[in-house]
């Protein structure tokens, strides 16, 4: 499978500078967008200096990598922008997909209107980053997001034209996975600015391979190579340095660990702007390679339900499962499965601070997203070839065998515990999602 999806912008992105203002126009692309709305947002940023610094930091994340070659690093990738429901969100991944970043401009962070809502892709090359870096504290800056234009208005001159860029396949996979990890995470720590600065000063130099742990010593947080009972495990702790330039500007830092420590989310607050950074468990294991979404993709969801979500939802809208159940006549007990399924398909993002999903339609066909899970495809192939046999089944235990290559694997499901005799399960112990044999057995049980 190709590692990138190449697409054609209808027009280039550019920064148009005149004597009295600057206008930033960002192009967009979508395989699925129904309405060609010319503008998603137009208005004035109330704190453009903070917004500009957050977007520059997000760009640094997008241009970073913690396990790729110099050749791969030369390929710039583009953030995704969602505007609607009185919020503007910019999000992106590092090249290796082990770091996910998002900038949320919330109500009060702008003075403007949302003529329509939607999701678009924009390219942040160096000229654009330089323009964002040049925003001063007292400047009046106008912003618009749409099909043909996003405008930053300030003093200056000249024009910057951006090129189209390919969007990596693993970005799409990462977007579907990171939301499920964030949804399972809960806030554990809230630090003020001084505590946040103290914490980041304890990040070891270099690129430590060993795990570090966020521990509290009295009122002072720090990173330690030794874990304690209530500590938070962070692999690849040096990745947090990406958000270090924002610390002196932030008022608060909140930490949201995954219950199994498979990810951590770090959120900085600047009044009406929020910057989020999520780290995968290890540098070499990005969100795109995780199996968190696989369980949600086992059970098929009728196309009419997906169409129903698309019908009443709009960009950044809070996803209300109860409303979906009521309006479409779906049994309430199935709504949780539908929510997880929609998140796994990229239709939902997650706001850890407000503890809810929000609708965000990725600009790609659902069939493409669903085709990006090789383990699930392998499980379906095992079923098609008749290689799955259920030996016994009771209320709390299932035993099955799955024919492999020159070997037969045994699968045991006992309550929430599941085991398989294959090498994948032996190596990962379920930390990276179920193996194809367990997926095949589960899919057969519900078919």
Where are these regions (language model features)?
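Long, low-complexity, compositionally biased intrinsically disordered regions
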Residues: 1-447
């Amino acid at each position: 499978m190709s590692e990138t999806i190449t697409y054609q912008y209808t027009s280039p992105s550019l920064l148009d500078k005149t004597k009295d203002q600057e206008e930033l126009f960002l192009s967009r692309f979508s395989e699925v967008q129904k309405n060609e709305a010319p503008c998603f947002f137009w208005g004035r940023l109330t704190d453009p200096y903070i917004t500009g610094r957050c977007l520059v930091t997000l760009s640094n994340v997008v241009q970073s990598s913690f396990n790729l070659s110099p050749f791969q690093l030369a390929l710039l990738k583009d953030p995704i922008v969602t505007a609607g429901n009185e919020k503007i969100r910019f999000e992106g991944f590092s090249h290796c997909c082990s770091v996910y970043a998002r900038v949320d401009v919330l109500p009060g962070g702008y003075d403007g209107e949302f003529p329509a809502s939607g999701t678009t892709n924009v390219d942040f090359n160096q000229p654009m980053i330089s323009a964002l870096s040049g925003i001063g504290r007292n400047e009046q800056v106008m912003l618009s997001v749409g099909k043909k234009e996003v405008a930053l208005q300030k003093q200056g001159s000249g024009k910057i034209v951006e090129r189209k860029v390919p969007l990596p396949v693993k970005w799409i996979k990462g977007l579907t996975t990171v939301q499920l990890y964030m949804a399972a995470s809960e806030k554990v720590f809230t630090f003020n600015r001084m505590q946040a600065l103290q914490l980041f000063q304890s990040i070891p130099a270099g690129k430590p391979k060993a795990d570090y742990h966020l521990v509290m010593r009295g009122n002072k947080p720090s990173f330690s190579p030794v874990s304690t009972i209530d500590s938070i495990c962070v692999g690849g702790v040096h990745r947090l340095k990406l958000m270090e330039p924002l610390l002196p500007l932030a008022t608060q830092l909140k930490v949201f660990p995954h219950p199994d420590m498979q990810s951590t989310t770090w959120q900085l607050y600047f009044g009406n702007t929020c910057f989020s950074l999520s780290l995968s468990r290890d540098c070499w294991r990005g969100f795109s390679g995780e199996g968190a979404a696989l369980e949600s993709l086992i059970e098929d969801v009728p196309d009419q339900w997906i169409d129903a979500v698309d019908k009443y939802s709009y960009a950044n809208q809070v996803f209300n499962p109860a409303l979906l159940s009521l309006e479409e006549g779906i049994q309430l007990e199935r709504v949780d499965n539908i929510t997880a399924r929609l998140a796994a398909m990229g239709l939902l993002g997650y706001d850890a601070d407000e503890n809810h999903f929000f609708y965000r339609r990725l600009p790609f066909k659902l069939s493409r997203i669903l085709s990006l899970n090789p383990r699930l495809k392998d499980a379906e192939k095992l079923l098609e070839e008749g290689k799955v046999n259920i030996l016994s089944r009771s209320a709390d235990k299932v035993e099955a065998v799955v024919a492999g290559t020159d070997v037969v694997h045994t699968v045991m499901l006992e309550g929430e515990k599941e085991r398989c005799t294959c090498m994948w399960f032996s190596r990962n112990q379920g930390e990276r999602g179920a193996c194809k044999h367990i997926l095949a057995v589960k899919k057969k049980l519900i078919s």
